[in-house]
Amino acid sequence: MTPSHPRALPARSLLATALALALGSAQAQTATEAELARKLDQLASELATVKAQLVQLQQQQQRAAQPAPAAAPAPVAAPVVAAEVPRAEPATVLTSYGEINYNRPTKAGQNAQADIRRFVLGYQHRFDDKTKVVTELEVEHAVASASDAGEVAIEQAFIEHQINPSLALRAGLFLMPVGLLNENHEPTAFYGVERNFVETAIIPSTWREGGIQLVGSFDNGLTLQGGLTTSFDLNKWDAKSADGRKSPLGSIHQEMALAKAHDVALFGAANWRGIPGLLLGGSVFSGQATQAQAVTQSRITLWDLHARWTPGRWDFATVYTRGSISNTAALNTPLVGNDTLIPKSFDGFYVQGAYRLWSSEDYALLPFVRWERFNTAKSYADLGAGLTPEAARTERVITVGADFRLSQNIVFKADYQRFREATDANRYNLGVGWSF
């Protein structure tokens, strides 16, 4: 492209103007030949000056239009291809699970009820590659108020720090590593509308304590957990309430709500996953539980053994757990005459089998059956003739039903439960649950 000369136009205009003025002046006056010659010489000199300025201006513009010399040739870049870049995990992750259930007793249909059993929101935030915080907030039965049966509770709130690839430290409020259900209690993680009785009446799921915990994970499939935590509070035992008969430990756990911490507990758990599809494990918890409020010290101990095997389409699971409370004779003496005394021992056992009958893409139909045996007051300490309560009758429950999964995160459930002792409790259950 020919370079433009933005400054040349004013110079030409000046020359034209000068000539016009000169000619006009010559026509307006009678000039002598000498005067005319002088004016022509002056105009010639001015014209030469303007030409020199124009040449100088053109040279400047040409130099400006030339590219600057490169110090070194730049390497030719390869064509940019839209490669798929791995997406980094977000630092903060929202989690949730929930259960909406319907229960209809077979002998008293008028007592059927529907309930938002649980709604939980949580988040995990990773501060760096080694440290994160885990929290969950739970609402039970939809509404919590002075006139409603609902409850709002913090289910988890702890910091986890990865000391090395095999060892992690947790501090705060965390779930106890007991049984199969307590740490994995989302509705998509268990069969049936309701959680099994063994891991709710004997193991008080969802059971959490505040403290510190070490978690070791090894290449041979072994995971070890252990630590120091808060304990139960036997001073919360209400001998006039039926809560202790429903779940002895569930009625006296503190959930770290202004928890009395004079007495603490130790716990340990081991789980082995060395063979694909097989889990073998066990746990033990033991700690004083009178919190310096009673003359007699009392220790609560709970242990369990559990296994799960998932060969092909099958899914088998079993848990046995047993709990004991020491020195209950001294604790029960002032409670004699009330309906619910403190049991010396309690235990439970279940076996369960499920089968993936049909699946297509994300859909799956899984019928299952579960048989349970549990006793929340298997024995009492001797209080003397006529004062010692009789052991409770061992309850046996069979649950038959099916889970229909829309995906790994959404499940519809239906089942029937039959009780051997409390036959009035026989019922049909429907439910829907989710987790992410």
Language-model features: locations:
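Outer membrane beta-barrel
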Residues: V81-N235, H262-L280, Y350-R356, S360-S379
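Short Gly/Pro-enriched turn/cap motifs at secondary-structure boundaries
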Residues: A201-S205, L258-A261, V295-T296, H306, ...
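N-terminal periplasmic/intermembrane-space "pro-region" immediately following the signal or transit peptide
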Residues: T2-P3, L19, L23, Q27-P105
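Outer-membrane beta-barrel pore domains
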Residues: T2-P3, A108, A146, A157-Q162, ...
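Bacterial N-terminal signal peptides that target proteins for export
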Residues: T2-L15
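Loop-centered beta-sheet repeat module
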Residues: K236, D243-A292
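Extracellular/periplasm-exposed beta-strand and loop segments of Gram-negative cell-envelope proteins
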Residues: N184-E186, N196-P204, E209, A239-A242, ...
